Curated annotation (Swiss-Prot):
Pathway the protein contributes to: Porphyrin-containing compound metabolism; protoporphyrin-IX biosynthesis; coproporphyrinogen-III from 5-aminolevulinate: step 2/4
Catalytic activity: 4 porphobilinogen + H2O = hydroxymethylbilane + 4 NH4(+)
Quaternary structure and interacting proteins, as annotated: Monomer.
UniProt protein name: Porphobilinogen deaminase
């Protein structure tokens, strides 16, 4: 086991918060490991005056960080999963995620509490084509203008009257401690599906780095890791970019995902904690989606008792046509469900 880890991340306040959350998890299992944060300025951070879809998409927030990982200048990278494209360059892999936070979007406005309440022809600041598609579906009269920058800068633009409202991710507002219920209003999933992977912090490593894999095995939140598979499969199959209105949100139907592993263990071993400790490392399990082998075979057995429901959204490039689809599947076939939804919805959009 290594004594020190170099952790690559963006320099934004939110990215550094995410990185420190990962470090907290690492320290729980490996208290003696020294964690060095390596801040990296990405192309996406530097170019703020153009929409992401005009300059290469969200991958610009990863490019320099992934290159540092490939060059072995860092040992692992921390990302917001919503920024990670469906296809990751070899030999890199998302090997761990932290428990998902509330992935809903937030309507941020000083005078009104919802998109419906905005006056005719009001201006909403948002660069995300997903949000633009939902906004125009709800209120076709509203003007959606390009709105780049970090959370603080966007809120400042709102306060100075540059726009009438904006839409931001709840998790970012919460983690930065700037969620204010006086002008921040949660948007329900039925009105606006979140970005794929929203609310999830992801850890990326090189596949052949066994030391980092061991760490990821320990900190990985398996219920979340399984939950995002249909969302990510949907994204990967479509090879979607920032020009494509796309969304998906998965949830467990059978139990609280925080407790699924414990429930499964209790079912199998009837509370025999000594047997649990022995059996947890009894054999290996290879994850088909990553090719990685995890030494946590029984914990993932919660899949036998858990169904996942995923709501998908796909729009055409100009957002004039949007289709929705829902898949309910056993956890073991959730990746296939994402691919199935992508095929069906792509056909519907192209008609």
């Amino acid at each position: 086991m290594t004594n020190s880890i170099r952790i690559g991340t963006r320099k934004s306040p939110l990215a550094l918060i995410h990185t420190n959350l990962v470090i907290q998890q690492i320290k729980q299992f490996f208290p003696d490991i020294n964690c060095e944060i390596v801040p990296i300025i990405t192309s996406g951070d530097l170019i703020q005056n153009k929409p992401l879809y005009d300059i290469g998409g969200k991958a610009l927030f990863l490019k320099e960080i992934e290159q540092a990982l490939l060059d072995k200048k860092i040992d692992l990278a921390v990302h917001s999963l919503k920024d990670v494209p469906g296809r990751i360059p070899e030999p890199l892999v998302i090997a761990a995620v932290l428990e998902r936070e509330d992935p809903r979007d937030v309507f941020v406005c000083l005078k009104y509490k919802s998109i419906e309440e905005l006056p005719q022809n009001a201006v909403i600041g948002s660069s995300a084509v997903r949000r633009k598609a939902f906004i125009q579906k709800i209120r076709p009269d509203l003007k959606v203008t390009v709105f780049r920058g970090n959370v603080d800068s966007r809120i400042k633009k709102l306060m100075t009257g540059e726009v009438d409202a904006t839409i931001l991710a709840y998790t970012g507002l919460k983690r930065l401690e700037v969620f204010n219920p006086e002008y921040c209003h949660l948007i329900e999933y039925s009105q606006m599906l979140p970005c794929i992977g929203q609310g999830v912090i992801a850890v990326e490593i090189r596949k052949d780095d066994n030391a980092m894999l061991e760490i990821c095995n320990q900190i990985n939140h398996l219920p979340t890791f399984e939950l995002i598979k249909p969302e990510r499969a949907f994204l990967e199959y479509l090879d979607a970019n920032c020009r494509t209105p796309i969304a998906a949100y998965s949830q467990y139907l059978d139990a609280n995902p925080r407790h699924l592993s414990k429930l499964a263990y209790r079912e199998v071993f009837e509370g025999n904690t000594e047997a649990l400790a022995t059996a947890a490392y009894k054999s290996n399990r290879t994850d088909a989606s990553t090719g990685l082998t995890y030494k946590l075979p029984l914990e993932v057995e919660f899949g036998k008792m858990s169904n996942i429901q995923t709501n998908f959204m796909l729009g055409n490039l100009d957002g004039s046509k949007i289709t929705f689809h829902t898949e309910t599947t056993n956890i073991k076939t959730s990746t296939e469900a994402g691919i199935k939804a992508a095929k069906m919805m792509l056909e519907a959009i192209c008609k």
